[in-house]
């Protein structure tokens, strides 16, 4: 793991130890919690991609999203090109 990734993991774990217990009630809508998701994402995908996944997860942790089980993906998703469910726009030859 890179130095940047180790630093980010330490930062999240510090949040888990010192700030999270002071909240009046659990506030995360997902399992694993957003902070645990961040640690796993950074450990699995590195500092940059892991932080991106963690930020996207925190943005989704709101009352408009139902929540539930949302594990860290095994492989970093590729958003280049069309979505797999989008029909191709190629013209017939």
UniProtKB/Swiss-Prot annotation:
Residues 82-93 have a biased composition (Basic residues). It is found in: Cell membrane. It is a peripheral membrane protein. Keywords: Cell membrane, Membrane. Belongs to the UPF0161 family. Could be involved in insertion of integral membrane proteins into the membrane. This is Putative membrane protein insertion efficiency factor. It comes from Deinococcus geothermalis (strain DSM 11300 / CIP 105573 / AG-3a).
